[in-house]
C-alpha cells in the first residue's frame, strides 16, 4: 500500500456565505414557494454558478434585463443592487418584484443619496462594470458620481469643487487597496466627507483577515469562488500580498491542477462570500484522496450577522 504524502490544510474561518448572500438565496427559495415556478431573477442572484444552477433546478429563470421578463411573473433583483430605473420600470409594468439587494449595499445607496441631497460631488471607489457599481451609480442622475478605481485615478481626479466632496465605496473591495485610495484622496482633499461606517462589508474584511493570517506559511492558497466574484478575486490578491508562495482561484475541486501540489506540504483554503460550503468540503475530500490531510482551522472572527427577509416574503 502506497503511503500518502502529508498535507497540512489551513482552513479559514469565517469563509463562504455571508448574511447578504444567505438572504438573497432564501428570497429566491421563498418566492418560489409563495408564487410557484417560474420566478425570474435579474442577473445572477449571487456570483456563483453552482448556486445559480441549483436555483434554476427549482424553477428560477435568470435573465440580464427586465425586458426579458413577462409582466405576469414575479422578478427578483440580485444581491448586488440595481439602478433606480429598474424598480421604476417594474412598477410601471405592474410587476410583482422583490429587491434582494444586500442591506450593506443599500446602506451605500442611502449614503450616496444623502451626499447628493447635500449638493456634494460624490466619488465612488469601485470597479467599472461590476453590477454593484452600476447599481450604486444608478441611484443618482447620470454624471453625479465619479468612479475611481486606482490610486492613480485618485491622484488625477479633478473635482468641480475641492471643498465639497464625499466618497463611498463598493462593498467587496480589498481593504488594503481601498485604504491606499482613500489616503490619496484625503491627502489631496482633507475635507472630503467619509462614510459614517466603513463601506467595506464585514464579511469581505473578515475573509481577507483570515487569509492574511495563514498566507505567510502557505506554499499554496486555494480560493473557491467565481471569476465574476469581486470578493473572491480580491482574496487571491490578498493571499499573494500577505506572503503565500502561490494562490489560485477555483470554482470547485474539478478545477484543481494537481501539479500545483508538487512539493507542497502546506495548503491554505478559503471561499468567497458567494461560495457554498459543500464546495469547500469537496476540495478537502479531493485532497484526502491524494494526501494524508491534517486540517487546522484558522479562526479570526465570529460572524453572527443575519438580515431579515423582505416583508412580502416574511412569516
From Swiss-Prot:
What does the entry comment about cofactor binding?
Answer: Binds 1 [4Fe-4S] cluster per subunit.
Q: Which residues bind [4Fe-4S] cluster?
A: 18, 102, 201
Which pathway does the UniProt entry assign to this protein? Answer: Isoprenoid biosynthesis; dimethylallyl diphosphate biosynthesis; dimethylallyl diphosphate from (2E)-4-hydroxy-3-methylbutenyl diphosphate: step 1/1; Isoprenoid biosynthesis; isopentenyl diphosphate biosynthesis via DXP pathway; isopentenyl diphosphate from 1-deoxy-D-xylulose 5-phosphate: step 6/6
Supply the alphabetized keyword list.
4Fe-4S, Iron, Iron-sulfur, Isoprene biosynthesis, Metal-binding, Oxidoreductase
Under HAMAP family, the record lists: IspH
- The family this protein is said to belong to: Belongs to the IspH family.
Name of protein: 4-hydroxy-3-methylbut-2-enyl diphosphate reductase
**From which organism does this entry originate?**
Hyphomonas neptunium (strain ATCC 15444)
Amino acid at each position: 500500500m502506497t503511503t500518502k504524502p502529508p498535507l497540512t490544510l489551513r482552513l479559514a474561518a469565517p469563509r463562504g456565505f455571508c448574511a447578504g448572500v444567505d438572504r438573497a438565496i432564501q428570497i429566491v427559495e421563498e418566492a418560489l414557494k409563495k408564487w410557484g415556478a417560474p420566478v425570474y431573477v435579474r442577473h445572477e442572484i449571487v456570483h456563483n454558478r453552482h448556486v445559480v444552477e441549483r436555483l434554476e433546478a427549482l424553477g428560477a429563470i435568470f435573465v440580464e434585463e427586465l425586458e426579458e421578463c413577462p409582466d405576469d411573473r414575479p422578478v427578483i433583483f440580485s444581491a448586488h443592487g440595481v439602478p433606480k430605473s429598474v424598480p421604476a420600470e417594474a412598477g410601471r409594468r405592474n410587476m410583482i418584484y422583490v429587491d434582494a439587494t444586500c442591506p450593506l449595499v443599500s446602506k451605500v445607496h442611502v449614503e450616496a443619496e444623502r451626499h447628493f441631497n447635500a449638493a456634494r460631488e460624490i466619488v465612488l471607489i469601485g470597479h467599472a462594470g461590476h453590477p454593484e457599481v452600476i447599481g450604486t451609480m444608478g441611484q443618482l442622475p447620470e454624471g453625479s458620481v465619479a468612479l475611481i478605481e486606482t490610486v492613480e485615478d485618485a491622484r488625477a481626479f479633478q473635482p468641480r469643487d475641492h471643498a465639497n466632496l464625499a466618497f463611498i465605496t463598493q462593498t467587496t473591495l480589498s481593504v488594503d487597496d481601498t485604504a491606499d485610495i482613500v489616503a490619496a484622496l484625503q491627502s489631496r482633499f482633507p475635507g472630503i466627507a467619509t462614510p459614517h461606517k466603513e463601506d467595506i462589508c464585514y464579511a469581505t474584511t473578515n475573509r481577507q483577515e483570515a487569509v492574511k493570517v495563514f498566507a505567510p506559511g502557505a506554499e499554496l492558497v486555494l480560493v473557491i469562488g467565481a471569476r465574476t466574484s469581486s470578493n473572491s478575486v480580491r482574496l487571491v490578491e490578498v493571499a499573494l500580498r500577505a506572503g503565500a508562495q502561490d494562490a489560485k482561484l477555483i470554482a470547485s475541486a474539478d478545477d484543481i491542477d494537481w501539479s500545483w501540489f508538487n512539493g507542497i506540504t502546506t495548503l491554505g483554503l478559503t471561499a468567497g462570500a458567494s461560495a457554498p460550503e459543500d464546495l469547500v468540503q469537496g476540495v478537502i475530500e479531493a485532497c484526502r484522496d491524494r494526501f494524508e490531510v491534517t486540517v487546522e482551522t484558522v479562526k479570526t472572527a465570529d460572524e453572527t450577522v443575519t438580515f431579515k427577509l423582505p416583508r412580502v416574503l416574511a412569516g
